[in-house]
Amino acid sequence: MRTNIAIVGSTGNAGRKTIEVLERRKFPVNILYLLASKKSVGKFVKFRNKNIEVRSLEDFDFRKADITFFCAGSKLAKTWAPKIAKDSIVIEYSSYFRSFKNIH
């Protein structure tokens, strides 16, 4: 089964490393959506010999992503991760949710 993946914070260190791991491990990606802040929108990131354009986090429909890797900071995680989780599985890297008992 191939999976639609979104990466929030795709141009930062954690986002770039996530892209690298997905490629190196040959993760079965169907569509890769790269999302970031407005300052990074329009940039291109290479994944499996294709240039993928970075899109706006604010404008993305997370129903398109089966899994979302949230590679942005705690402030954004607090606001965005719960919204995204309504439509996509969220794997969140910041420290914001670490002390929450009901987070798995």
Annotate each predicted stretch with a short phrase.
Residues M1-H104:
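N-terminal Rossmann-like NAD(P) cofactor-binding subdomain of oxidoreductases
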